[in-house]
Amino acid sequence: MLTRKQYELLRFINERLKEAGVPPSFDEMKDALDLRSKSGIHRLITALEERGFIRRLPNRARAIEVIKLPELSQAAGNRRGFTPSVIEGNLGKVRTSTPALEDGERPVAVPVMGRIAAGTPIEALQTRSHTISVPADMLGNGDHYALEVRGDSMVDAGILDGDMALIQRNETADTGDIVVALIDDEEATLKRFRRRGASIALEPANTAYEVRILPPNRVKIQGKLVGLYRKY
């Protein structure tokens, strides 16, 4: 399990490697994560290396190799149904101009309906509070709403505490989908959905949490996860 800062740094390093072919400097990492000193970056780098997500190459300056990402750390069979699409801050990158938007990039107002637990289930969904703007091509067809994620039980699927989960309204789900599940009409939780015989399994993406096995009459599907909205 990664902390939020560890995950943010790992994503930043991976994106910079893809864009520039070289990892960011420690100063760039410090600025991107809004840390006061480079010692914090050293600790994060060490933690990521100890957990097997990166490797520092000896005798080379700024030589960091990303070995895996949390979203990719599970077997493909355990990830069916969702690959995170994330709207996020630009991590310090500056755009010199603003290009014209294509139709699919034009924002759509998505209502925020409260909070959802990625941990111990919390109270049922609340009423609409405000809206966020999301590119239309990120959502696809159907009706959508957003929920603020609370907890870390889905961190290995790339879903962090504080993210906005973008949900497509749906009352059914396929095995492997990440869903909003309403338990006993009282508790709402964000988990991976699986069928186990005549029962339903709600699986976390964090080994610190247990799978919940419930009869179908206790679980109502409220929607499926289609993306994440993340601000830095």
From Swiss-Prot:
Classification via InterPro entries: LexA (IPR006200), LexA-like (IPR039418), LexA/Signal_pep-like_sf (IPR036286), LexA_DNA-bd_dom (IPR006199), LexA_repressor (IPR050077), Peptidase_S24_LexA (IPR006197), Peptidase_S24_S26A/B/C (IPR015927), WH-like_DNA-bd_sf (IPR036388)
DNA-binding stretch(es), residue numbering of this chain: 26-46
Key words of the record: Autocatalytic cleavage, DNA damage, DNA repair, DNA replication, DNA-binding, Hydrolase, Repressor, SOS response, Transcription, Transcription regulation
GO biological process, one term: proteolysis
The organism's place on the tree of life at top rank: Bacteria
Any one GO MF annotation of this record: DNA binding
Annotated site (Cleavage): A118, G119
Enzyme Commission number(s) from the entry: 3.4.21.88
Active site per UniProt: S153 (for autocatalytic cleavage activity), K191 (for autocatalytic cleavage activity)
Catalytic activity as recorded in UniProt: Hydrolysis of Ala-|-Gly bond in repressor LexA
SUPFAM superfamilies registered for this protein in UniProt: LexA/Signal peptidase (SSF51306), Winged helix' DNA-binding domain (SSF46785)
Pfam family, one: Peptidase_S24
Function: Represses a number of genes involved in the response to DNA damage (SOS response), including recA and lexA. In the presence of single-stranded DNA, RecA interacts with LexA causing an autocatalytic cleavage which disrupts the DNA-binding part of LexA, leading to derepression of the SOS regulon and eventually DNA repair.
Subunit structure: Homodimer.
Family: Belongs to the peptidase S24 family.
NCBIfam families per UniProt: lexA
Name by which UniProt lists this protein: LexA repressor
Gene name of the encoded protein: lexA
